[in-house]
């Protein structure tokens, strides 16, 4: 009797399990030690089964990153959606970004910390189109902050673009430091109340970036 074809939901669940398993291997052993055979072994299937869903480990890497940035974008827009006021929207997105980083440490690591191949590493390869898609997903998240912070800047043109990008990346580096030092538990080594520090530091960073409107 022929095997019943998998439903679309079952296929997506299997693809998701493969990505979750690959993510765990990358976090534990590094990207260089990731292999299709190792993923298959952990899932109790053959390597051929994995190849039915993904071409190679580079496609898996990019799909994990795409999935992560989709999760981040959805969270940012969900938190910002209730607000029409730009300042409230910005505050909501900042808190959503921190929430994402602290509650999804494995995804945050592969998206922002680990030395895994990214778009520029795939330029000129067969997988460049997928890498481009991954980069565009990442930039969508960045552009949410560029648009929000840019609303405070009265002038236009390249001068504004450069100024806003600098401010956003500077702010992003502060957020990244907060999340990374929390996830690595280094804050726990020097602070008695990490949660209170995170709340206070978050408020301080938001206040500092909003002050940009006072310059003009």
What kind of region is each of these model predictions?
Residues 17, 25-59, 63:
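Helix-turn-helix
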Residues 77-107, 158, 164-171:
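Hydrophobic alpha-helical connector segments
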Residues 1-13, 83, 213-216:
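N-terminal intrinsically disordered/low-complexity leader segments
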Residues 91-121, 142-146, 172-177:
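Helical hydrophobic small-molecule/effector-binding pocket
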Residues 11-22, 39, 64-72, 76:
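Generic hydrophobic, amphipathic alpha-helix propensity
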